[in-house]
Every structure is written in C-alpha cells, then in structure tokens.
Amino acid sequence: MRLTPHEQERLLLSYAAELARRRRARGLRLNHPEAIAVIADHILEGARDGRTVAELMASGREVLGRDDVMEGVPEMLAEVQVEATFPDGTKLVTVHQPIA
C-alpha cells in the first residue's frame, strides 16, 4: 500500500485519536496532543460524512469537556484548525475554545 505524505498524516492522526478514545474509555484524562487528535478526527470524519463547516465548528466544541482532559489543557487550546476535504473542496475549519 502506497500512501502520500498527506494520507500518512491523516492515518497517524486517526490512530492517535483512536488511542486517545481508548484511554478516555478507561477513565484517563487526555493530554494536549490527545485532545487535539480527538477534535481534529471529529472534524475530518464529519467532513467526510458531508457535514458543513458551520456544523463542525459548533460540534467541535462539544467533543470534549473539562472533565475529559488534564488540568491546564483547556487553557492551552485556544483553537484547533484542521484542513478538511468536503464534497465541494478543501476548507480550513477553525474551532475556537474547543474545550468548554
């Protein structure tokens, strides 16, 4: 299987998000990179499912709460930006204050 660098990056992000979800399911709080991976994966999969940029910007704020992440992580994450592929092209999705 041959993957482009872009596809390798997406695959790595997807795996990091899956690992973070398993840790969260075990009751562990997520660190900064894990939180970004989960939110970014949510956006990428939502775009693949045909959701709009506005929907993903709103739902991206509901993926994780303060109880899901380690202390200090919400303050470190002012925004998460992901370049996602939509049916009508690639767009930058920005989620401001992703951990409420």
Swiss-Prot record:
Major place of localization?
cytoplasm
Query: What does the record give as the reaction this protein catalyses?
Result: urea + 2 H2O + H(+) = hydrogencarbonate + 2 NH4(+)
What are the alphabetically sorted keywords of the record? Answer: Cytoplasm, Hydrolase
Please state how the activity of this protein depends on pH.
Answer: Optimum pH is 7.2.
Q: Which GO terms describe its biological process?
A: urea catabolic process
Q: Where is the protein found, in the record's own terms?
A: Cytoplasm
In which pathway does this enzyme or protein participate?
Nitrogen metabolism; urea degradation; CO(2) and NH(3) from urea (urease route): step 1/1
**InterPro entries assigned:** Urease_gamma (IPR012010), Urease_gamma/gamma-beta_su (IPR002026), Urease_gamma_sf (IPR036463), Urease_subunit (IPR050069)
The UniProt record lists the EC number as 3.5.1.5
Q: Which residues are the signal sequence here?
A: none
**GO function terms (MF aspect):** nickel cation binding; urease activity
Give any Gene Ontology cellular component: cytoplasm
Which NCBIfam families does UniProt cross-reference here? Answer: PRK13241.1 (NF009712), urease_gam (TIGR00193)
**Partners and quaternary state?**
Heterotrimer of UreA (gamma), UreB (beta) and UreC (alpha) subunits. Three heterotrimers associate to form the active enzyme.
Q: Which family does it belong to?
A: Belongs to the urease gamma subunit family.
What is the official name of this protein in its record?
A: Urease subunit gamma
State the organism named in the record: Mycobacterium tuberculosis (strain ATCC 25618 / H37Rv)
